[in-house]
């Protein structure tokens, strides 16, 4: 019988199918220590889970790890939920994690510190963003469990201190996996209502695990985004949660939160009484001062002799009117003088004057130009006549009229010496009235003797 050989891929896929169809391996709860932790740029987490005797590769994709409450680190002990599968490329089995939590109180404290540091770096704890708690809130919203001692303490304290105030309770879960989303939704609902002036968010005391909902990042960010001022009241005085740092004001207990949110009506009544007395005293003092002033006025000269005062004022009015008339006349005279000066200036600098002056200047220049052109033409004409006379005196035609002629060779070059021709050469002689074509039949040389 021929043996059947499997490929590595086929074997790996077979093993992967076996594992993935095993119901016990599709929902595995596992605890271990993180090592070789790597956070990929795309958001996926890759690490190893180990205990004293074994280890397993672990993967947590970005879609799942964005909801975890802490930042994983090497050496941290965790509780995870996931499924087992095979990574074909390496042939190794690994756990694909869907949920992860710190294992033990120590790791919860680490997760708490990690979130606190990160939110503080983002500025969520800064005093710059803290809203002022209104001193006389008409309506107080309370976000807490409807059945705990905290709600009883808060309502009792508000009704005792400020019975005219309104209280609206937003019942929520304060511990467990659904607590944080429940608190976040209540904060959003309260912000959609216009009548809420201040919010109390909190619960009674408990362990770190029981208070953990108030350490959730989503709760911290919901408190930070709230338009309504929030007083946090979580646990006892020694309990501090992330919500306390983000809230606009932290109360050590729910009862203290109610005291901070609701003014004491007895103290308010006392303040109103004191201010009423102060106002009455101020009014009495004001009336007394006005009465004294009235008495002074009644004793004054104006009240005792009103006619004389009237006559004085009438005389002052007449003088003022006279001064006004004089001032008006001076003002008019001043403006008339200014107008005359401006008219004289405009007349002096009127464009017609400048046009006339320019026209005279142009006519003068034209006459001067004509004279200079006439003189120049006469000078040039005289020079031309003299030059023509000189040219005529030097003209060969004048010489020819006295019986002389010009002799040219066959190339029409003027012959200046008998040495330039030979016997039999054809020459032409230009006379005054024509040209003779000749042939050299004899040559007789003569010595030059002073031109003779």
Curated annotation (Swiss-Prot):
Which CDD domains does the record match to this protein? ExoVII_LU_OBF
Give GO terms: molecular function aspect only: exodeoxyribonuclease VII activity; nucleic acid binding
Q: What is its main location?
A: cytoplasm
Where can this protein be found? Answer: Cytoplasm
Pfam families for the chain: Exonuc_VII_L, tRNA_anti_2
Q: Name one GO cellular component term.
A: cytoplasm
> What reaction gets catalysed by this protein?
Exonucleolytic cleavage in either 5'- to 3'- or 3'- to 5'-direction to yield nucleoside 5'-phosphates
Give the main EC class. hydrolase
Any idea which UniProt keywords this protein has?
Cytoplasm, Exonuclease, Hydrolase, Nuclease
InterPro entries listed in its UniProt record? Exonuc_VII_L (IPR003753), Exonuc_VII_lsu_C (IPR020579), OB-fold_nuc-bd_dom (IPR025824)
Q: Can you state the subunit structure given in the record?
A: Heterooligomer composed of large and small subunits.
Function, as annotated: Bidirectionally degrades single-stranded DNA into large acid-insoluble oligonucleotides, which are then degraded further into small acid-soluble oligonucleotides.
Q: Which PANTHER family match?
A: EXODEOXYRIBONUCLEASE 7 LARGE SUBUNIT (PTHR30008:SF0)
Q: What is this protein called?
A: Exodeoxyribonuclease 7 large subunit
Q: Which species?
A: Bacillus cereus (strain 03BB102)
